[in-house]
Amino acid sequence: LPLRTVMPSVTPVCFGTLYTGAQPAVHGIRKYEKPVITIDTLFDALLRAEKKPVIVAETDCSMSKIFLERNMDYYIFDTVAEVNAKAAELIMADTYDFIAVYNGNYDATMHKNGPEAPASLAALKANAEAFAMFYELIKSHWRQHNTLIGFATDHGCHEIDGNLGSHGLDMAEDLNIVHLYGAYPKEY
């Protein structure tokens, strides 16, 4: 699904919009900062519907900060490997209705090496492989549910001087993004 993210195209602003449906002026994050969002979010809607959401993310990333202070579970780890292992464990346990998993390894690597550097592409490939693993686990462990699975980036990126990567500008490379979704009906 081709989409266009919001400006400025930096992670906390973009995640604010992604999980609230509101523009930055409404959800309150207009620059790279990580306050707790206090307006209604997808997580709040799930909680009102008596669903059980969880966030699994890396320490100090936007996902581990801006959606805190809700009556839900948060699993915060220092490494992507720990994040992915916990996400796999939670999928297999089948105790949550919504699992938000955030891996910041491509973004971090892209900033240091450039968007298409071998190390950056390896991080991107690792994220695709993790998503494929989650997909297979969901297919085998969530058969009794109607399930929507998504791979949703928050912003794009571009190369800057010195072969580094960046984002945050009003340009196609930073704003044009693609989300991938799949739906799996409950098996009766």
PLM regions and their residue ranges:
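Feature captures the catalytic ectodomains and active-site-proximal regions of enzymes
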Residues: 1-188
